[in-house]
C-alpha cells in the first residue's frame, strides 16, 4: 500500500459462515475475519474475529483477537476468498513473514504455522488457492530488495512444494510479482507487477502454465495517448466466461486480457477510472466491476461501478463518493 493513501490502517478481511453444528444459541451465523496492525507499527499484528451476523444482538462486536509474536509489522494481504481448507494465509510485509491461521472452530481461530523467507524468496504478497487445494503465492524479491522474485507453491498446510522465477534473463525488465489471477479452464496463472517498496514503476504482466509453473509470456501494457495509466498492473479478476481477465493498474487504467491459450495473448485498454487517484482492490460481481479509488491530492475518493457485460466497452453505471477524508483500498466478496 502506498504511504500516501489516506487510509492509515491496513485491514484485510474474509467472511465465513459457521457450519450448522457450530451454531448454537447466541452465537453468530456469520463472522468477519480482519487482519490488521496498530497505527504505529509497534505492537504485534493480529487477526480479529467480528460478529457479522446482522440478525444477532451483538452484531458488529469483537469476538476474539489472535496476535502473532513479531512486532513492528505490517499486516497486509490475505487470500481474496477463504480457502476450502479453512486455513487463512496472512502476510506481514515489513517482516517478510507468512502466518497461517486454522479456523476449524470459526469463533476461536488458532495460529498454526509461520515462516519467513523460502528458498531465498522474500516479501510475500498475494495468496490464492489452486484447483487441487494447494496455495500459490507471489514473492516480490529473491535474495535481496533489488532482485526479482517469483511464484511459490505450498500445500494447504504451508509445506513448500516448488517455485519459479519471474526474472527475464534476456532483457532488463523491472518486475515485482504482486497480484494473482487463476484461469483453470485454460491452465493459466496471471501475475501482475507492483513494487511495494516503490523503487520503480512496473509495466508488465506475466502468464504462467498452472501445471508446470513455466513462465510463458511477459507482456508490456499498451501505452495510452495523453494518459499515464499503464504504470503498475495491480489486481485482476477472471470474468464469467472463465477465459477473459480484466485487471486495473494502480494508476487507474482498466485493461482486458484475452486469447490466453494462444501464442500471442492480447491486452487492450478499455477504461480510465479517474485522474490522479490510486485504484486498488476491485470486486467482480456477475457482470459488474466494483473499483476502489483513493486520492491524497483532493481528487475523487470512493467506489466506481462498471457494467462489464461487454468487457471491451465497459460502462460506468454508478459511483459512491466517500469524501475527502476516506480513501477506499480493499473490497472482498462475501463467499
Where are these regions (language model features)?
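Beta-propeller domains
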Residues: 180-304
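Beta-rich, blade/repeat-based domains predominating
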Residues: 69-83, 118-131, 169-187, 223-244, ...
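Blade-loop segments of beta-propeller domains
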Residues: 59-129
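Residue position within the beta-strands of beta-propeller blades
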Residues: 34, 90, 137-138, 191, ...
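Asp-box/WD-like beta-propeller blade repeats and closely related beta-sheet repeat scaffolds
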Residues: 106-184, 193-195
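Short loop/turn segments immediately following beta-strands, especially the blade-tip
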Residues: 49-58, 100-109, 157-159, 207-216, ...
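Short glycine/acidic-enriched loop and turn motifs that connect beta-strands
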Residues: 38-41, 94-97, 141-145, 195-199, ...
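Beta-propeller fold detector
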Residues: 58-68, 110-117, 161-168, 215-222, ...
